[in-house]
Amino acid sequence: MADAPDGGSADARVDAEPSALARASMPVYVGGYLALYGMGDEGELVLTREQVARALPPAAPLPINIDHASACEVGAVLALADDDAGLFFVGVINCPQLADTLAGVAHPAFFGADAPSLTPRERFLYLVSNYLPSVSLSSRRLAPDEEADGTLFAHVALCVLGRRVGTIVTYDATPDACVAPFRRLSPRARAALLANAEAARAALGDRAWPVPREALAQTLLSTAVNNMLVRDKWDTVSRRRREAGIAGHTYLQASAVFPLPTGGEGPERTGGRERAQKSAVAGGVCIALPVAGGRARQPELPPAPPPPPPPPAMSAAHQAGAASAHPLPAGDYVYVPTAQYNQLVVSQARGAAMTAAPPPAPYFLPAAAAAAAAPPPMPGWYGAAGAAPWHPGYGFPPPGLESQIMALAGAIADGRRVQAHGADGSGYDGPLDRRPLAKRRRYNWDHPRGRSGGGDDDEAYYPGEGAPAELPPHHHSPPPPHPPPSHALSKLASAVSSLQQEVSQLRAGYPYGPAFAAAQHPPAAHLPCLPQQYTAPPRVGAGPAQVPTLAPAQAPAQALSVPAVAAAPATVAAAAAVGPPEEPGVAATVDASAMASLPPAQPPQACDPAEIFVAQMMRQR
């Protein structure tokens, strides 16, 4: 065992004796895929089936540690299998100090209402399953022309997130229960794994792997610190579970709620462990999908009986929580947010209604009837002579989105012209802060030249004239450096594309034209309209008649939602092995555990008028 950092032996740092509850919680078994074949791993993380076939069986037993720290070895790998989907392992963990460390920092409310009925082993399984849900295989880095052999695999590490696809593990009290949630594991590999695991466990006997609590605490804290910047950690864990084909797992919750979720009744127990599957849907709609191959999965247990009706005093939140605790029927599901589901239903119904009932034919009046039925001019109407919407001379206003597209196109043309001519080219006056001042502002007032008493100036001063360039340096700060040319053309182009899509959607859903106007504003029948009365006769010869100008009403603001830009995933870097720097062989391995790091510092960018224009326009939409 490695020496302690302060020079004393590690044996002296081990606590006297672990607690009785910690001994009762051991051993536990862990299993999962160390790598999946052809699932998208890149670079040195790629592990082919040919390499695995050459590396099995390993030349030496593979230890299991925490986050690649050799000083925190907590178990060993019992069996490895080359499955059709990937490399699968089954291991044993027997470290009472790990159970004491996790139980000592867990809050009593973590286990919820089921805390009195949980055994010490189940408590440890909940803690370790949610703190270290992933696995990382450390392999030796091969030379360009080197072939894999039995020394390829170095060790297996329990971690928060693995860099390889589908590397989620399950912890349980027996090897059989540990392997059961993996639905993609072939029966041949399952039988071989269980047989080899039982034989290896019998050979090990009651061996334990004691670790100093200080080393455990330091490693567990470093795991939390190095992964605190991981974005959407539990979403990634859920995706990795689906990639590995895990279904019906008990202890991995992947929930944002602090305590463990509780059901309406006590969970059913089979063989000393909990088999009730806890699942909750928050703010979403669960939609069942057909199972591939036409076969439905059979549930492991019959559905639990419905809970008793809640008392009248129970709040709506409690009723919603009790309803969400019901077990879902077997099958594959997709969780859709309620708002998006309602929007899909409304759009589907609207499309069906428009298809079933096409817009009515346009309504046309004869020339004489149209002249008689046309109402007098009203404020806000478009068209010739202030006609009503159903009048033949009515001109429909252009959509507001088309005006925005035209403005965007003009901004793009200006940006291209600036890039083509440069800062000193023709047609470019320079940035606003470098142009001569056009007027004097009240809050920038200073004494006119020749009147301040600070010196004589022969030049004449005229109101409204800007200050010349030869003013003393204390009047104005030196001009800032010329900003770089605009780089927002791509953003403007994407905004134009999105606006064009919205225009096409609006035209498809709400067509403009006489047909639409006739449907929305039918003509008022049997309402004769008298000619407009004037208070005084118009004067002849007094000049041309003044035609009243009517300001067009603004088009209604379009309330279409713009698709949000997906956040870029957090940059994941390889985690260095935790241990003394002088330990040999650390740099020669490939550790597949993830660690989130801070993004590189971005230099401040100059203010871009095009970006400001796009931001202001999008904010008003």
Curated annotation (Swiss-Prot):
A motif (Nuclear localization signal) lies at residues 439-442. SUPFAM superfamilies: Herpes virus serine proteinase, assemblin. Residues 266-277 have a biased composition (Basic and acidic residues). Residues 258-277, 295-322, 420-497 are annotated as: Disordered. The active site is at H68, S136, H155. One of its GO terms (cellular component) is host cell nucleus. GO terms for biological process: nuclear capsid assembly; proteolysis; viral release from host cell. Its EC number is 3.4.21.97. Residues 601-621 are annotated as: Interaction with major capsid protein. The keyword Cytoplasm does not apply. GO terms for molecular function: identical protein binding; serine-type endopeptidase activity. It is an enzyme of class 3 (hydrolase). The keyword Protease applies. Residues 300-313 have a biased composition (Pro residues). The record marks A254, S255, A596, S597 as: Cleavage. Keywords: Host cytoplasm, Host nucleus, Hydrolase, Phosphoprotein, Protease, Serine protease, Viral capsid assembly, Viral release from host cell. Pfam families: Peptidase_S21. Residues 487-497 have a biased composition (Low complexity). Residues 331-350 are annotated as: Interaction with pAP. Region of interaction between pPR and pAP is called Amino conserved domain (ACD). The region of interaction with major capsid protein is called carboxyl conserved domain (CCD). Belongs to the herpesviridae capsid scaffolding protein family. This is Capsid scaffolding protein. It comes from Bovine herpesvirus 1.1 (strain Cooper).
